[in-house]
């Protein structure tokens, strides 16, 4: 399956994906829906343009690189798997996005202290493990979230929702997108 960036400066660029079943890249239609909502919803405060974005459970980096392609100021990437990190580094280099990218090799549930705060947090964890609430708590505790950070997560359709007021929720086949503000502000 070819994984392509959908829009922006790098539209159509093919990204490498990790071999095997290590990751589950977001489907193009789900990524399109995510970024459409970030660009047009009134609560999204103008979307990714000129804002720092953090891609958590980054995998191939498709979400963070899509954000950069669409004008994000910078993208942080958190990924723990060494083989996946190598693919992510190659994708960042292929997009010539090294200067705009910060790659952190870490478990999203136990990240190091943040080098910066991020305004938009994109989470795409494995389905069925209820990792979003744990990751958001860990990211807050270590300083990754701006006080008014917008959190967007892709969950499995049957995954439990976080205990926070959602700004929006949309289903796309087996995936569900949720959006909410930093609950720790």
Question: For the regions a protein language model found, what residue spans apply to each?
Answer:
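Class I S-adenosyl-L-methionine-dependent methyltransferase catalytic core
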Residues: 1-185
